[in-house]
């Protein structure tokens, strides 16, 4: 059930993003008088689940039917000497078609829902794209086609999708900020008890109980942003307060690589172990532990904090151990049977207070812009790490499983929209990369045309697009292959 909930959230988020992205291309095309032949959610190879189109002023709807026949006849030609085949395309006389034949309505758009849930597309007349419509491109250019428009108009059409994804992220962040404000765990709050570190943090030179003073001389207000700060800014040192004095902890040269390979955060906040929940039927309930109890000892070992308890309790797997518990003014010693898993069935209560910043609607507007462009900048930095082999960031590339895993186990509307905004930014940044087959590839060739006043040939664009799609397919296979490999680790 958890997997299904995650999948549904992923599909819903991607559907919203694809529709918004393609709508950006669609509306820009219509503004400049370029016809849009098809607007589809998901891909419709061979047939579609649903489609509709306005023909002669009337809307027609079709369900689970094959795609419409082409508007061109393919004629095969064989060279009498070389025996090589070539093809020419002859337009069908649309006037001879039945009145309700969708091909007659060239000036309207066919909207539909495909059956392959890998995105969607907007088929713009006269444009070399993933459809590779050679029949259309072999005809004389028409005034309503993409290829006949000035370079600046084609440029706006191509960036329309990316622009709409950025706008969507801004609007979502404005809405979330205005309605919910911003909640975060401040570094100052964490410093009340100090941090706890795992083996990686310990290897860096950090210790349990350290209090974060600065990162490369900069104070980080939001505690949970510290790990990403270390990765994106290639931090040299962390200043901590330890035993009443400030200590500089210098990070090793391979810190970024190790952080990227690490599956969990190398630092966490530290809290006293006060039981917040006792799971029914587990060892803790059977032993008589209750909500509000504070565990201060496991056997003879002092466990003032939850991280101390976790380190000690695993030493007693499949054994009985005495826990010293504070219950109100009383100190109680309770024997508890520890199962093989090392988990006795309790959860710690959150005793730290999250900071909340409230925003009015008007204050939320500039905050929405700031947050969006900050996220864009951070994602660019992450991409630079991926293309730098020394960081090993390429090893962490993930596909649909990795994306789906970031959604919560149950639907939480705030978290859903927050992740949708983040994915919208990722889609915008990825699409603007100068790779043929992506919007950025088209933009690259258009900028070349503007600068040189020479338009790349259709043949060159077709080959470049094919190469780009092969590269993207390899990248897709690699990313999703990484996901599958991680499942079996």
What are these regions (language model features)?
Residues 61-68, 462, 468-486:
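Primarily interfacial, aromatic-capped hydrophobic alpha-helices that serve as membrane anchors
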Residues 3-137, 430-452:
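Small-residue-rich helix-interface/hinge motifs
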Residues 157-194, 226-277, 322-324, 333-355, ...:
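PDZ/PDZ-like peptide-tail recognition elements
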Residues 201-223, 284-306, 464:
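Conserved PDZ fold ligand-binding element
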Residues 171-179, 428, 432, 476-483:
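Hydrophobic membrane-targeting alpha-helices
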Residues 2, 137-152, 262-286, 294-297, ...:
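Functional transmembrane alpha-helices
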Residues 9-13, 20, 31, 38, ...:
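Internal alpha-helical transmembrane segments
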Residues 30-34, 177-185, 389-393, 484-488:
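Transmembrane helix-loop junctions in multipass membrane proteins, especially transporters and channels
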């Amino acid at each position: 059930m958890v997997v299904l909930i995650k999948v549904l959230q992923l599909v819903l988020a991607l559907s919203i993003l694809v529709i918004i992205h393609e709508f950006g291309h669609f509306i820009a095309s219509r503004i400049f008088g370029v016809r849009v032949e098809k607007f589809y959610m998901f891909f419709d190879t061979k047939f579609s689940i649903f489609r509709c189109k306005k023909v002669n002023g009337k809307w027609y709807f079709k369900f689970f039917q094959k795609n419409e026949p082409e508007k061109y006849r393919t004629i095969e030609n064989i060279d009498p000497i070389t025996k090589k085949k070539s093809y020419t395309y002859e337009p069908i006389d649309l006037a001879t078609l039945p009145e309700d034949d969708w091909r007659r309505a060239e000036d309207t758009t066919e909207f539909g829902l495909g059956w392959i849930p890998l995105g969607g597309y907007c088929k713009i007349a006269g444009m070399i794209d993933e459809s590779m419509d050679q029949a259309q491109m072999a005809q004389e250019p028409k005034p309503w086609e993409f290829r006949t428009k000035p370079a600046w108009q084609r440029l706006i059409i191509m960036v329309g999708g990316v622009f709409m994804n950025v706008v969507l992220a801004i609007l979502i962040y404005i809405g979330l900020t205005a309605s919910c404000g911003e909640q975060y765990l401040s570094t100052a709050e964490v410093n009340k008890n100090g941090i706890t570190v795992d083996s990686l943090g310990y290897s860096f030179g950090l210790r349990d109980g350290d209090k974060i003073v600065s990162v490369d001389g900069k104070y980080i207000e939001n505690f949970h942003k510290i790990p990403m700060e270390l990765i994106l800014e290639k931090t040299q040192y962390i200043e901590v307060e330890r035993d009443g004095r400030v200590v500089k902890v210098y990070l090793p040269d391979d810190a970024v690589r190790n952080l990227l390979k690490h599956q969990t955060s190398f630092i966490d906040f530290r809290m006293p172990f006060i039981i917040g929940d006792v799971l029914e039927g587990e060892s803790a309930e059977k032993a008589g532990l209750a909500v509000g109890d504070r565990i201060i000892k496991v056997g003879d070992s002092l466990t003032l904090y939850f991280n101390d308890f976790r380190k000690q309790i695993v030493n007693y797997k499949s054994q009985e151990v005495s826990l010293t518990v504070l219950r109100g003014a009383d100190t109680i010693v309770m024997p508890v049977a520890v199962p093989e898993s090392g988990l006795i069935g309790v959860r710690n209560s959150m005793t730290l207070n999250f900071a909340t910043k409230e925003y009015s609607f008007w204050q939320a507007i500039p905050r929405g812009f700031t947050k969006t462009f900050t996220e864009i900048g951070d994602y660019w930095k992450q991409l630079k790490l991926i293309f730098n082999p020394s960081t090993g960031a390429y090893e962490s590339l993930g596909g649909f499983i990795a994306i789906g895993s970031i959604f919560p186990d149950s639907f939480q509307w705030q978290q859903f929209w927050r992740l949708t905004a983040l994915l919208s930014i990722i889609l915008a940044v990825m699409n603007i990369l100068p790779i043929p087959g992506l919007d950025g590839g088209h933009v690259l060739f258009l900028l070349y045309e503007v600068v040189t006043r020479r338009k790349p040939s259709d043949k060159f664009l077709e080959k470049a697009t094919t190469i780009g799609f092969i590269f993207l397919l390899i990248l897709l296979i690699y990313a999703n292959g990484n996901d599958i490999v991680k499942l079996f680790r």
